């Protein structure tokens, strides 16, 4: 069975775990509606994506 040759140092362990951190999702303000939305996602309220109408806008009821 394979065994580690040396003990993993705290520095190396920390560098390995640095990619596991959870970051807050970023938001961009929509130019038309002023609402916050995720970058590279369509705005569900207006149905727009990159200036094009992709979905029908949600009707207010």
Curated annotation (Swiss-Prot):
Keyword Ribosomal protein: yes
Family the UniProt entry places it in: Belongs to the bacterial ribosomal protein bL32 family.
Biased composition, class Basic residues, residue ranges: 1-16
UniProt keyword list: Ribonucleoprotein, Ribosomal protein
NCBIfam families noted in UniProt: rpmF_bact
GO cellular component: large ribosomal subunit
Protein name stated in the entry: Large ribosomal subunit protein bL32
Bias (Basic and acidic residues) ranges: 27-44
Biological process terms in GO annotation: translation
Gene assigned in the entry: rpmF
Organism: Nitrobacter hamburgensis (strain DSM 10229 / NCIMB 13809 / X14)
Entries under Pfam families matching the protein: Ribosomal_L32p
GO molecular function, one term: structural constituent of ribosome
Region (Disordered): 1-61
SUPFAM superfamilies (UniProt xref): Zn-binding ribosomal proteins
Superkingdom field: Bacteria
